[in-house]
């Protein structure tokens, strides 16, 4: 190699190295899609996550939050994340059963008795293992936020017994177990994407729906629903997922920033959600909702009606996953 050839090679190598470092240093902007409107605790948590990412990256990574289903429903945004056009999606973990059947276990009625149980399970080996299964589907599970415990609303009548639910046309999350448990109560399930729900309630296409108090308040369902029954029949963790297609292009340092920010933001969001719950109920009452509760005996009837549904879907989810979750809960309840 001549001196001039060597010099050209050294210069070329230097240019390549510089180009690589510049690409590495380029600012990144990622989109985060979710269904609830601004002001909801999930959006507050997403905004906190964006703040943490910006702080931890020195402003090199920006997360733009798109609330209110503005980028599409959950099915659309998950598909877009797999394709790399939407990087983050924050959604009900049970909806991911369309990708990995094990996630349906999160929609089992009355699975978690309280928030502490839920935290221990989702933050522990069980929850992390389920998130790990998303990689084969083009997604990376980063952390669990929460929607919380679900309650029923309707425009027809107060619910004080399980029999009062029979005959109601209830919107459900579009997956099999939610259809089945509503049928088990003698009601008529209507699967609808969340952005369609308010209009369906307003137009009386459905009689009611079920969601945590925070969702009922933030989406102003009190404008189109008169009756609220505090059933706490299902706890919903929310998965913050990221496009694996994009993840595979990130440096280890950038990945760690996102992982650390997600873990911190998830704990922040859960606490915000829980601190807000009592105030949400008061606000719903002030906005005219009539609130009822089921007695212990009626809740026992509700649980009994869910047993065949849980048995059926345990076969769908798989015995190993169900047994692993039950083992975790058994340890917590000793």
Which positions does each model-derived feature cover?
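Bacterial N-terminal signal peptides that target proteins for export
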Residues: 1-11
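Cleavable N-terminal signal peptides
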Residues: 12-13, 23
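Short, flexible helical or helix-coil boundary motifs
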Residues: 14-17, 332
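Sec/Tat signal peptide C-region and signal peptidase I cleavage site
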Residues: 18-25
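N-terminal secretory/targeting leader peptides
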Residues: 26-117, 125-128, 132-334
């Amino acid at each position: 190699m001549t001196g001039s050839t060597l010099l050209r090679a050294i210069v070329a190598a230097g240019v390549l190295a510089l180009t690589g470092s510049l690409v590495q240093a380029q600012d990144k902007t990622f989109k985060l899609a979710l269904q609830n409107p601004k002001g909801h605790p999930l959006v507050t948590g997403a905004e906190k996550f964006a703040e943490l990412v910006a702080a931890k990256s020195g402003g090199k990574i920006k997360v733009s939050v798109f609330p209110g289903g503005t980028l599409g429903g959950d099915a659309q945004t998950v598909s877009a994340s797999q394709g790399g056009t939407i990087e983050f999606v924050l959604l009900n973990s049970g909806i991911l059963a369309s990708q990995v059947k094990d996630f349906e276990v999160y929609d089992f009625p009355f699975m978690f008795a309280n928030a502490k149980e839920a935290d221990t399970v989702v933050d522990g080996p069980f929850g992390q293992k389920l998130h790990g299964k998303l990689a084969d589907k083009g997604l990376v599970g980063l952390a669990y936020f929460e929607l919380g415990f679900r309650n029923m609303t309707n425009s027809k009548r107060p619910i004080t017994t399980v029999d009062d639910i029979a005959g109601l046309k209830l919107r459900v999350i579009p997956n099999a177990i939610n259809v089945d448990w509503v049928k088990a109560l003698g009601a008529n399930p209507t699967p609808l994407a969340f952005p369609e729900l308010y209009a369906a309630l307003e137009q009386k296409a459905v009689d009611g729906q079920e969601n945590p108090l925070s969702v009922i308040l933030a989406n102003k369902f009190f404008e189109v629903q008169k009756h609220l029954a505090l059933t706490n029949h299902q706890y919903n963790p929310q998965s913050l997922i990221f496009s694996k297609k994009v993840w595979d292009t990130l440096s280890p340092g950038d990945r760690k920033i996102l992982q650390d920010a997600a873990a911190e933001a998830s704990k922040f969001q859960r606490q915000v959600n829980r601190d807000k719950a009592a105030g949400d109920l008061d606000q719903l009452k002030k906005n005219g909702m009539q609130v009822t509760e089921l007695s212990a005996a009626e809740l026992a009837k509700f649980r009994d009606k869910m047993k065949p549904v849980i048995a059926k879907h345990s076969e769908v989810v798989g015995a190993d996953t169900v047994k692993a979750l039950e083992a975790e809960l058994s340890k917590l309840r000793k």
